[in-house]
C-alpha cells in the first residue's frame, strides 16, 4: 500500500498591521499645542523651535502656529512651529 504522511502546515500566512507612522501635519498647516506633527521610529526628523519630542520620538507642537520643515546641517530635516 502506498502511504504518505500528512504534509506540514505552512509557516507563512501572517502579517502585522502597519504602525501608522509618518508626517501627520504638513508644512503650512496650522497646529495647536499638543498636535502630533510626526510619528517616527528614531529621529528621521529632528525637533526645531516650539516643538517637543516624546519618548517614542514623536514630534508635537507646544504653541499654536504654522508647521515649517527645514533642512539643516548634514542633511538633517528639522520641523518647527512658527507662532501666529
From Swiss-Prot:
For this protein, the record's InterPro entries field holds: Ribosomal_bL27, Ribosomal_bL27_CS
What are the start and end residues of every segment in region (Disordered)?
Answer: 1-21
Read off the Gene3D superfamilies from this record.
2.40.50.100
Set out the biological process GO terms recorded for this chain's protein.
translation
Membrane spanning stretches: none
Q: What is this protein called?
A: Large ribosomal subunit protein bL27
Give the gene name: rpmA
Fetch the Pfam families from UniProt.
Ribosomal_L27
Q: Kindly list the GO molecular function terms attached to this UniProt entry.
A: structural constituent of ribosome
GO CC entries: ribonucleoprotein complex; ribosome
Keyword Ribonucleoprotein on entry = yes
UniProt keyword annotation of Cell membrane present: no
Q: Which UniProt keywords apply?
A: Ribonucleoprotein, Ribosomal protein
**What family, per the record?**
Belongs to the bacterial ribosomal protein bL27 family.
State the organism of origin: Pelagibacter ubique (strain HTCC1062)
Amino acid at each position: 500500500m502506498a502511504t504518505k504522511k500528512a504534509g506540514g502546515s505552512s509557516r507563512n500566512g501572517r502579517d502585522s498591521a502597519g504602525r501608522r507612522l509618518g508626517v501627520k501635519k504638513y508644512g503650512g498647516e496650522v497646529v495647536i499645542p499638543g498636535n502630533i506633527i510626526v510619528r517616527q521610529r528614531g529621529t528621521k526628523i529632528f525637533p526645531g523651535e516650539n516643538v517637543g519630542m516624546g519618548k517614542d520620538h514623536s514630534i508635537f507642537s507646544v504653541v499654536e502656529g504654522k508647521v515649517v520643515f527645514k533642512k539643516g546641517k548634514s542633511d538633517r530635516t528639522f520641523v518647527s512651529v512658527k507662532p501666529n
